[in-house]
């Protein structure tokens, strides 16, 4: 995975001003290698991640959609241009990641944004985000959701967590996130697929009923 740590400084810098490709193509290469070795079913692979991993998920569910059967995007990036105007780290974005301001390379930032590739998206995508996130503003998830919902080419769901930031801190939100992620993957990778699973979760019923037993 070009741009990751553990292989020296030069390797870690390979994703600077090189968003999405080749770094997310490296993830796909890993999937294809596992398929070639007969370890996974090529039609039953999902992808998930948070923050930059959420960006990887959104990209994979749009630009590389034919390779993934399900995706769960958490506090992720969908628009590299609008992210500059809504994040609390614009200077870090320029100095470390993009190595450019939007006015320096507008077209590149647009084309490395998942929303640009939304018409290709056929992967069922669950999007979750904290409403109080200042690092990656929840509008990033709202944009991705609205583009995919408008196109109508794949199931999409948006879940927002009140009071949560760039990662859920409260136990209830952590549980809710985990259960939604697992259910989405179960539904599309092992279940019947099609329309999304019901929005409500069983733990909500248990809380309302005051019972620990599964309904």
Where are these regions (language model features)?
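Active-site-proximal cap/loop segments of hydrolase catalytic domains
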Residues: 1-215
